[in-house]
Amino acid sequence: MWNKPSDSERIDAVTAWLDAADIAYDLYFHPASPTIELAKRHWRDDGSKHCKNLFFRNHKGNRHYLVCFDCDRTLSIHDLEARLHQGKLSFASPERMMRYLGLEPGSVSPFGLINDAEHHVHLFLDRNLLYC
């Protein structure tokens, strides 16, 4: 069973990864937000681009996908299924999210992939994020 990392362990893992990659960053904190509408209440107006991050599983439950796209866009799961050619998708459970990403609903981020030591989760980025 996966042990839930503490908030400080999560922060330390991300900052250590960014430091090792020599990526400059500033930390901003806000509560976990299950919707973009709630998250927007905490975002700074600094020109940053924000994403929706959704965690899916395939119909067999043996493949998992983190999908990141512009927060101002909508996503049709059926369109995503057709584009990714991965079969029927559904949202992964909180237990799967914790097991593979070390995260809870409302806090999904690509940084959760740091916790995926076995590289089980497939990451898909919306091409529109290239222009951020």
What are these regions (language model features)?
Residues 1-132:
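Extended, low-hydrophobicity, polar/charged segments
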